[in-house]
Design a protein with these regions (language model features):
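Active-site substrate-binding loop specific to GH73 endo-beta-N-acetylglucosaminidase modules
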Residues: 169-382
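Cell-wall polysaccharide-cleaving catalytic domain and substrate-binding groove, primarily
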Residues: 48-99, 198-202, 208-214, 224-230, ...
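Short amphipathic alpha-helical segments and their helix-coil junctions
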Residues: 36-47, 130-140, 176-177, 227, ...
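Flexible, low-complexity segments enriched for small/polar residues
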Residues: 37-43, 48-52, 57-70, 306, ...
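N-terminal accessory alpha/beta regions
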Residues: 69-159, 163-174, 180
Length: 494
């Protein structure tokens, strides 16, 4: 059962209606729709205070796609107190290859298309590839025990965004997800950056394959060079000029993607005769003439470990894990670790999680993006899911379908762009609680309440804190505690 809703909903409804005003303010109502049907109120975006959210719930909300009751209990038992338990959990998640995850791997292994070698991807219809890649993404986010790894896969997928609908990306993005993002998500940034630069999908998406020099008067295609500096490394205001963009484009000329050979279609090749082999100067660094394919390595070394790159990535990681407006102290600490560790992603993450702002000052201050909201709901209520694709319609309506963001900057990671998703979040919460999403997704509300020791326990499990007196009263009046809790402000923020 899929609810109907207008496509032209105001993008301001969500934060005005759900965040600025408590959903629990309505009185005298008996139906859940009455609680959620109030008029949106004007006012600033105000997240919950985060007061009462315990450390384990906070860490699980940030490092995973939302806690499920069994995982919360497991993590609580890892130490003599919450601090030691969280420390153990952090180290556990920073070593994903040591975490047994056979159940998830078996489920993903059945999706044969996403495991196909590069040249064989063209044997599949593009819609089939998108479906299998999306299904694998949802399975991993929902079921995997390697949760931080999956969160970082999403982070890098946005950082090195590729819209799967663009030309050959419809086939090649599958290989990019497998060989670039997932392979290097918790490794070294320099290796990730080079893998992305030589990704067939990226060469198609940002026109790198068209960057060639065939005559003295021909200018290089600068599309990828510009995004490399602006989005992948230094960032806006990172100290580069238009001249640097052109020089980087010259360094990267000559790389292309084979298109005709059946078995090698999609293979990346370097054509020396299409490369600008003259001397270049990038960010004050001289690159000698005659470098050929080595020019790519030289330029990536210059920009990959640049102080501006460290700050740009440090800020993005702090935004992802701490708040939409992280402190300068946190950014500097993370950027410093990035440089001192030579781009080691695990060490950089340790620096993020060691900041006092992460540990103490940011609880319930990050709005869940639609993908995070839906997956956290499925995990939080331990839904039995036999077809993850049945939630994709909701993701499309909320504007957060995987691999379908049209511009290179990737899906935004702050609250304000997601202001138009309130009604669809409500629809999903109600449908999930009532077992109306689809016949392939089932929730047992009474069992959840019983295992939680009552409705208050269920509320504590989903909100990460004990419910307030007002919340308890509203839940009792609604008659549908699970739907109300998942639609409440406390469940929208993490």
């Amino acid at each position: 059962m899929k609810p109907e809703i207008s496509d032209d909903l105001s993008r301001r409804i969500f934060l005005r209606g759900a965040m600025g005003v408590s959903l629990f303010a309505t009185s005298g109502c008996e139906k859940i729709e009455d609680f959620l049907g109030m008029e949106p109120q004007e006012g600033p975006v105000v997240p919950p205070s985060g007061e009462g959210v315990d450390l384990v719930s906070h860490v699980l909300n940030r490092l995973t796609f939302g806690p499920d009751p069994s995982e919360y209990a497991r993590v609580k038992g890892l130490g003599v107190d919450d601090e030691s338990a969280v420390a153990f959990f952090l180290e556990e998640q920073l070593s994903p290859n040591e975490i047994e995850d056979k159940r998830t791997q078996r489920a993903v292994r059945r999706l044969e298309a996403i495991h196909a070698p590069l040249g064989e991807l063209y044997e599949y219809k593009e819609d089939h590839l998108l479906e299998q890649l999306t299904r694998a993404t949802l399975i991993r986010a929902t079921r995997s025990k390697r949760q931080l790894f999956e969160v970082m896969v999403h982070f890098w997928s946005d950082h090195f965004n590729i819209d799967i609908s663009k030309k050959e990306c419809r086939w090649l993005k599958v290989a990019d997800d497998r060989e670039v993002v997932r392979k290097h998500a918790m490794g070294n940034f320099s290796a990730l950056l080079k893998a992305s630069a030589l990704s067939p999908a990226m060469l198609w998406y940002l026109d790198g394959r068209e960057n060639r020099k065939s005559g003295e008067s021909e200018k290089p295609n600068e599309n990828y060079a510009r995004e490399l500096l602006e989005l992948h490394t230094l960032g806006v205001g990172g100290g580069y000029t238009q001249k640097d963009v052109m020089e980087v484009a010259r360094c990267l000329s000559g790389w292309t993607v084979r298109g005709k050979d059946r078995f090698f279609k999609g293979k990346v090749e370097f054509h020396a005769d299409a490369h600008d082999d003259g001397a270049k100067v990038v960010l004050g660094n001289e690159i000698a003439s005659g470098g050929g394919r080595k020019d790519l390595d030289d330029i990536l070394e210059i920009v990959g470990m640049h102080p501006s790159t460290a700050r740009f990535l440090g800020r993005k990681l702090c935004i992802r894990f701490i708040s939409d407006d992280p402190s300068e102290a946190s950014i500097k600490k993370v950027a410093g670790t990035f440089l001192s560790s030579n781009g080691n992603i695990k060490e950089t993450l340790r620096a993020v999680f060691a900041t006092q702002e992460f540990l103490q000052g940011s609880r319930a201050q990050k709005l869940k993006r639609p993908f995070e909201f839906i997956v956290s709901a499925l995990r939080g209520v331990r839904a039995r899911v036999s077809s993850e694709m049945d939630v994709v319609d909701y993701l499309i309506r909320m504007g957060h379908a995987p691999f379908q963001y049209p511009t290179p900057d990737g899906y935004p990671d702050i609250a304000s762009p997601w202001t138009g998703t309130l009604l669809w979040r409500w629809h999903f919460a109600i449908a999930l609680a009532r077992n109306e999403v689809s016949e392939n997704i089932k929730v047992e509300e009474e069992v959840l309440i019983e295992k939680a020791g009552g409705v208050d326990g269920l509320a504590a499990s989903l909100l990460g804190r004990n419910p307030s007196i007002e919340e308890k009263a509203a839940i009792e009046r609604s008659g549908e505690p699970l739907a109300l809790l998942m639609a409440s402000p406390g469940f929208q923020w993490k």
